[in-house]
């Protein structure tokens, strides 16, 4: 298996495991805003998390992170992001989470899945995704972890 750059223009959905966590807050949501600003994010974003939040709480988390990184964010971009954000909640070890996610992704053909979760959960998540049946073309992206 070789690493290659993933072009989000190919994706019809971006799935973020760990969407309510620290990595998403500090890095991913500001990056998604920046990508929206320059037009390179053209797909919905589905967060996956164990935190039991509704849409408003999830959006507040995302927009709080964006506001911290960009003091005067574009209201139109935020409104578009809000309309494209959704959250699937469940335990990473529970098969029902993956069934719920599969239902959300049923019409998608080219998802990019980003694991912003502790490495200890990678096995559970990849096995859970495999059990519900892969979509025709999926990119699985892991954050680079450096230890010094």
Regions found by a protein language model. Name each.
Residues 95-99, 109-136:
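Beta-loop-alpha module in the N-terminal Rossmann-like domain of NAD(P)-dependent dehydrogenases
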Residues 41-81:
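Glycine-rich phosphate-binding loop and adjoining beta1-alpha1-beta2 segment
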Residues 70-110:
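A structured beta-alpha segment of the ubiquitous adenosine-cofactor-binding alpha/beta core
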Residues 138-144:
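Conserved small/polar residues in nucleotide/adenosyl-binding loops
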Residues 1-51, 55:
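N-terminal low-complexity, Ser/Thr- and acidic-residue-enriched intrinsically disordered segments
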Residues 28-35, 62-71, 101, 125-131:
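Short, well-ordered amphipathic alpha-helices
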């Amino acid at each position: 298996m070789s690493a290659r750059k993933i072009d989000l223009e190919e994706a019809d959905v971006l799935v973020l495991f760990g969407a309510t966590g620290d990595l998403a807050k500090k890095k991913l949501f500001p990056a998604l805003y920046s990508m929206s600003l320059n037009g390179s994010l053209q797909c919905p974003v589905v967060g996956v998390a164990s935190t039991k939040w509704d849409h408003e709480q999830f959006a507040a988390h995302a927009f709080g992170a964006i506001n911290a990184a960009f003091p005067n964010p574009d209201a139109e971009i935020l409104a578009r992001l809000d309309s494209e954000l959704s959250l699937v909640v469940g335990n990473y070890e529970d098969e029902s989470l993956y069934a719920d996610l599969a239902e959300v992704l049923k019409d998608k053909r080219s998802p990019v899945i980003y694991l912003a979760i502790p490495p200890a959960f990678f096995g559970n998540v990849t096995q859970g995704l495999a059990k519900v049946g892969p979509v025709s073309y999926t990119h699985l992206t892991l954050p680079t972890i450096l230890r010094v």
